[in-house]
Design a protein with these regions (language model features):
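Electrostatic, structured charged patches in enzyme active sites and in nucleic-acid/phosphate-binding
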Residues: 1-153
Length: 153
């Protein structure tokens, strides 16, 4: 079911970390995908006894380095990307979107950014059964609008 959403695309901001500990921000319409494909992860995952999700690192042959994931579903998507010949780069949690959505400021850290031959691909990993939840549907709708306004997939 499509969600109608109002997003102020002109003021949407992308925040990223060029290196661990640093933070930079840019209007989304002015951000360079090349800069984001070199970004450090926005956050790192935590391990603790009894945690419900499955975090870890995966050695990616595409990246020639470890790539983090926060769930088994993210790991499955990471594996698919690593074996997809069109994917040239894989960056975990590369940036945070901040935008005015439905007259309220919202933030979201995307799961992955893939550099492909056809351009950047933003990946948010969501279990299929959660897509009917109104909050998840809204999140996916407004992030999709920003991504598409940049000419990305």
């Amino acid at each position: 079911m499509p969600v109608t959403v109002r997003v102020d695309l002109e003021s949407a901001v992308v925040s990223y970390r060029p290196a661990a500990g640093e933070e930079r921000s840019s209007l989304a319409r002015k951000v360079s995908s090349e800069v984001l494909l070199r970004a450090a992860p926005w956050r790192t995952f935590r391990w603790y006894f009894g945690q419900r999700h499955y975090s870890g690192t995966y050695w990616s042959s595409t990246q020639g380095d470890h790539v983090i994931y926060e769930s088994r579903l993210e790991l499955a998507n990471l594996l698919l990307a690593d074996f997809d010949s069109r994917v040239r780069q894989i960056v975990a949690q590369p940036f945070m979107f901040r935008a005015e959505v439905q007259a309220q400021v919202r933030k979201h850290i995307v799961d992955y950014l893939w550099g492909t031959d056809d351009g950047p691909v933003v990946v948010d990993v969501v279990r299929a059964e959660r897509m009917s939840h109104p909050g998840i549907a809204l999140l996916c709708a407004w992030t999709r609008l920003i991504v598409e306004s940049l000419g990305w997939s």
